[in-house]
Regions:
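Conserved catalytic cysteine-centered active-site region
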Residues: 24, 56-109, 140-151, 219-245, ...
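Active-site-proximal alpha-helical scaffold in enzymes
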Residues: 87-116, 154-184, 252-259, 324, ...
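Conserved beta-ketoacyl condensing-enzyme motif
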Residues: 22-133, 188-210, 283-284, 304-326
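Short, well-ordered amphipathic alpha-helical segments that serve as non-catalytic structural scaffolds
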Residues: 26-42, 67-71, 95, 146-153, ...
Length: 390
């Protein structure tokens, strides 16, 4: 049984700790996006959804209590199940591949798949970092911080500070151009945020709408980037300016069987032609896509030259440049509207967010094949190949 993506939406991406979503629960964001999916799909009732699959990289605290099920109950009702999926930065794309696989296996007809993450509310390491001492003794590289893995990748693959800063500038410039052109407008669900606080013993409140990605710095320059100090290693090349931003956001797509799609008289947007994951040395985790991309191409029976557009998650500029170099990617096809350095990286949401973005840009450019790929903390990579339909 074939599976198709019918539609997809996302929130704008907020700056963690200082942006519009800094006090907003991630399940609140997810509910708004999912309800938009359902409301904009003629004939689809909430009870017709077989499962809600929610990617989340730190499912604890405000993202605990099995956030996938919690979101399903709130968005669609108690009769719709939900689960939480965690493959760190790949979680949002992983949920889409699970939904597709379940439909292809005949296990269901309709899935909501994506992810949600609040990096404002949950720290990067979670609330209790408690690694097994055997990890430190036997596989110490697994515990190396993400910034230091980017430094390791840069050193191994010869990526310079100058190249990293130039790549970061490109990300901001392209993202600013995309926002100015309104490219993200139709895919973003505007979120009304209400804030309440006490000031001078008086209750204060305000409401505002978040409908634009907040991380883009339109005044970024090479001179400004060059002044930033290394963030993780003395003499290193990774700075706050050439690393992805910590972010808040949610994104989901509707995945449906051909049978249900025809029953409802719907048209598909795309199909997932392949999705592969791979393991790499945790010390060089950023190179993960180089291992995953060939596996995905082999699954799809395709050559790299057939891919017309690529969304490569910019965990770090050094990491992205190393992937482009080692995987033989055409830089002009990569992140045509900017990437995570400018637009943000809300961990468990990112894979779905990039899927929504690339499908819309492929439609504008009338392209057939696109790829979403990302490195994954702990030493993994993921790559998904999408075929645009209609």
């Amino acid at each position: 049984m074939d599976a198709y993506i019918i539609s997809g939406y996302r929130t704008a991406v907020g700056k963690a700790g200082k942006g519009g979503f800094k006090s907003t629960r991630p399940d609140d964001l997810a509910v708004e996006v999912i309800q938009q999916l359902i409301n904009n799909t003629p004939g689809l009732e909430p009870a017709m959804v077989d499962d809600v699959l929610v990617g989340c990289a730190n499912p604890e605290g405000e993202q605990g209590l099995q956030i996938g099920r919690l979101i399903a109950v709130r968005a669609l009702g108690k009769d719709v199940p939900g689960m939480t999926v965690n493959r760190y930065c790949a979680s949002g794309l992983e949920t889409i591949s699970i939904a597709v696989a379940k439909i292809q296996a005949g296990m269901g007809h309709c899935y909501v798949a994506g992810g949600a993450e609040s990096m404002s509310l949950i720290p990067m390491t979670g609330y209790k970092l408690a690694p097994n001492y055997n990890i430190a003794a036997n596989t110490p590289d697994y515990l190396v911080g993400m910034g230091l893995t980017a430094e390791a990748v840069a050193q191994k693959y010869g990526i310079t500070r100058e190249a990293s800063d130039a790549f970061s500038l490109r990300s901001h410039e392209r993202a600013a151009e995309a926002i100015a052109a309104g490219k993200f407008r139709d895919e973003i669900v505007p979120i009304e945020v209400k804030e309440v606080w006490v000031e001078n013993d008086k209750r204060r409140e305000r409401s505002f709408v978040v409908d634009t990605d907040e991380g883009v710095r339109r005044d970024t320059s090479l001179e400004g980037l060059a002044k930033l100090k290394p963030a993780f290693a003395n003499g290193g090349i990774v700075t706050a300016g050439n690393a992805s931003q910590t972010s808040d956001g949610a994104s989901f797509v509707l995945v449906m069987s051909e049978e249900m799609m025809k029953q409802l008289g719907l048209q598909p947007v795309a199909r997932l032609a392949a999705c592969a994951v791979a393991g790499v040395d945790p010390l060089y985790m950023g190179i993960g896509p180089v291992a995953a991309i060939p596996k995905a191409l082999k699954q799809a029976g395709m050559q790299l030259g057939q891919i017309e557009q690529i969304e490569l998650n910019e965990a770090f500029a050094a990491q992205a440049l190393a992937v482009i170099q080692e995987a033989g990617l055409n830089p002009e096809l990569v992140n045509v509207n900017g990437g995570a350095i400018a637009l943000g990286h809300p961990l468990g949401c990112t894979g779905a967010k990039l899927t929504v973005q690339i499908l819309n840009e492929m439609r504008r450019r009338k392209q057939k094949y696109g790829m979403v790929t990302a490195c994954v903390g702990g030493g993994q990579g993921i790559a998904g190949i999408f075929e645009r339909l209609n």
